[in-house]
Amino acid sequence: MVLISETSDDGSTGGDHQIKKPKKEEDRNKKLKEKVQVSLPIPEELILRCFLLVRRCHHPSLSLVCRSFHSLMSKLYDDRLRLGYTENVLYAYVGFPPVENPSWYILHRKPYRNLPNTISLKLCKIDSLPPMPWGSTVVTIGSDIYVIGGRVGEKLLEDVGVGYNKPISGGRRGETSIRGGHAGERRISDVTHINCRFHEYRSLPSMKMARCRAAAGVIDGKIYVIGGRKVRTSDWVEVFDLKKQSWSSVPGPYPEAFGRGEFLTYAVMKEKIYCLDLTRNIHIYDPKESKWESWTHGPLSASWNDSSCVVDNLLFCINTSVYFLGWPIKIYDPEKKTWFYLQGLQGFPANGLFVDGYKMANFGGKLVILSADVHRLRRYDCRKREIWCIEIAWERKEDGTFWGKVESVAVVLTPAKTTSVDICGTVTV
């Protein structure tokens, strides 16, 4: 098991830790350490009750007050979960192709200058989490993120950048892919579990088959993984039991697969897994009934893209086809099998944010969109690179129409290099 905890820049691994401090400073630090180790006059139970009411964004500051507070932080998460004092936290996987590793980021939400009813948003890098293999499948469950499969190889390194040439856990199993790819590339069967409470990760049992760009969904406490390879074995669908921590195969028959059996995107609605393959055909799997349904055309396949999310069993998607005509978001109802427009949205940015990479996520019932934007400042190559965050609340009226309200629009990251938002997802901590 690999276990890595986040450390500060001035930790013991820094380059100056061998420099001897003056004796006066050592004595002062020793006295301060003895002082903070004294038992607090307030009972621990009472301190925990007070901490339960503190927003998670302030926990790092609290843990630095003294060692006693730091030790209480680990107990705090379980109590918050038990009492229902949880928060939604947005994680993003941001790439900097082709010169720098992609990295995990967390969206920090803090009161702006301690002013009431004001929130400052900022994407902060998480150094303790490793980059993912290209083509990995990602699902979130509670406070956990699961990274499944992917593809590695030297040719892939040249095509998409330095961050995608290694599996997270070292690549225990894989297969070389030549047809439909490049010699030297290989799919992997690795599975990694990320604990978002403490930003730690560990390896889980590998899948039976190596996969890349598979579809996945969580239903009844189990992770179903579909495709990511051609339909030619009995292991085209596998299921991971979270309690038993083991994989098993789901028997066929399977639907007719097109191309390499890989998928552009996927979603879970009404406890069914919807998959959009590379030729824009829809495959729907019902795990409870062990039934498949496939569409070769229709409204869903025509407008669905990988920048989408599901809220209340409805599929929300950026409407790229008519974005500049005032209808930036569409909603697909799986029961009525039709699309609706999200009306309202005064204040939605109209400066071409969605020309390049962007991702949408369900944030506690609201919509959050992260978009990498490049503004040309001059006639030549000088550009201002930004990642924007748009938060949207929405409701369904009695007449069946959908209305949205833009709650905030903010720049959350201004990197020095061109960026792309590869993944955007929410966990509960």
UniProtKB/Swiss-Prot annotation:
<feature type="region of interest" description="Disordered">
    <location>
        <begin position="1"/>
        <end position="32"/>
    </location>
</feature>
<keyword id="KW-0677">Repeat</keyword>
<feature type="repeat" description="Kelch 2">
    <location>
        <begin position="176"/>
        <end position="221"/>
    </location>
</feature>
<dbReference type="InterPro" id="IPR001810">
    <property type="entry name" value="F-box_dom"/>
</dbReference>
<feature type="repeat" description="Kelch 1">
    <location>
        <begin position="144"/>
        <end position="175"/>
    </location>
</feature>
<feature type="repeat" description="Kelch 5">
    <location>
        <begin position="315"/>
        <end position="359"/>
    </location>
</feature>
<keyword id="KW-0880">Kelch repeat</keyword>
<dbReference type="Pfam" id="PF25210">
    <property type="entry name" value="Kelch_FKB95"/>
</dbReference>
<feature type="repeat" description="Kelch 3">
    <location>
        <begin position="222"/>
        <end position="267"/>
    </location>
</feature>
<protein>
    <recommendedName>
        <fullName>Putative F-box/kelch-repeat protein At2g21680</fullName>
    </recommendedName>
</protein>
<feature type="domain" description="F-box">
    <location>
        <begin position="37"/>
        <end position="84"/>
    </location>
</feature>
<feature type="compositionally biased region" description="Basic and acidic residues">
    <location>
        <begin position="17"/>
        <end position="29"/>
    </location>
</feature>
<dbReference type="InterPro" id="IPR050354">
    <property type="entry name" value="F-box/kelch-repeat_ARATH"/>
</dbReference>
<dbReference type="Pfam" id="PF00646">
    <property type="entry name" value="F-box"/>
</dbReference>
<dbReference type="InterPro" id="IPR015915">
    <property type="entry name" value="Kelch-typ_b-propeller"/>
</dbReference>
<feature type="repeat" description="Kelch 4">
    <location>
        <begin position="269"/>
        <end position="313"/>
    </location>
</feature>
